[in-house]
């Protein structure tokens, strides 16, 4: 069975990787789909192309995982790709309430099912926005993201990391 794991992945975190790795064991193939919204274009830290490359690098060790992108309704992508199951990771009850609403809508308008996978407890506090915030101050994000994301974030905030390193050397 082939499934889709959608998200903005700006950037992919260790929590995403945890859910992905477990989904890859449960299903024949997982397509990581970077959803991009033209109305949110200025809000992304990484461009679509950068996010796709980070995902490819982070998932290259998983033979049954591929990377794609789409800029419309997820149910339209699912129909276009002939896929019927969405994978969503959950960190807390608050995620569940939101995701349940979306799952019901996806089922109603696109006849698509959603499978929820609970993130491991150690990743329940990690989000892409928190990782971006920590990285923007030069903080250590190495445990919170795969190596590909950490490298990309350090490049994006190279001046901050260089300044932080310089102050440590003094």
UniProtKB/Swiss-Prot annotation:
Listed EC numbers: 2.7.7.3
Keywords: ATP-binding, Coenzyme A biosynthesis, Cytoplasm, Magnesium, Nucleotide-binding, Nucleotidyltransferase, Transferase
First-level EC class: transferase
InterPro entries found in the cross-reference section: Cyt_trans-like (IPR004821), PPAT (IPR001980), Rossmann-like_a/b/a_fold (IPR014729)
Subcellular location: Cytoplasm
Annotated pathway: Cofactor biosynthesis; coenzyme A biosynthesis; CoA from (R)-pantothenate: step 4/5
Necessary cofactors: Mg(2+)
Any one of the GO BP annotations: coenzyme A biosynthetic process
Record's GO cellular component terms: cytoplasm
Primary residence: cytoplasm
SUPFAM superfamilies the record matches: Nucleotidylyl transferase
Residues that, per the record, bind substrate: 8, 40, 74, 88
Assembly with partners or alone: Homohexamer.
Function, as annotated: Reversibly transfers an adenylyl group from ATP to 4'-phosphopantetheine, yielding dephospho-CoA (dPCoA) and pyrophosphate.
Protein family according to the UniProt entry: Belongs to the bacterial CoaD family.
Protein name: Phosphopantetheine adenylyltransferase
Lineage: Bacteria, Thermotogati, Deinococcota, Deinococci, Deinococcales
């Amino acid at each position: 069975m082939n499934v889709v794991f959608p998200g903005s992945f700006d950037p992919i975190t260790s929590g995403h990787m945890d859910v992905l790795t477990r989904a890859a064991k449960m299903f024949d193939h997982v397509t990581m789909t970077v959803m991009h919204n033209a109305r949110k274009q200025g809000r992304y830290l990484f461009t679509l192309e950068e996010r796709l490359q980070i995902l490819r690098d982070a998932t290259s060790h998983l033979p049954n995982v591929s990377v794609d992108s789409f800029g419309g309704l997820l149910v339209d992508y699912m129909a276009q790709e002939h896929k019927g199951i969405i994978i969503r990771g959950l960190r807390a009850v608050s995620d569940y309430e939101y995701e349940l609403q979306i799952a019901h809508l996806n089922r109603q308008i696109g006849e698509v099912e959603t499978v929820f996978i609970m993130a491991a407890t150690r990743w329940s506090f990690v989000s892409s926005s928190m990782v971006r915030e920590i990285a923007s101050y030069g903080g250590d994000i190495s445990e919170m993201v795969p190596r590909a994301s950490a490298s990309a974030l350090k490049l994006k905030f190279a001046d901050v990391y260089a300044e932080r390193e310089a102050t440590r050397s003094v």
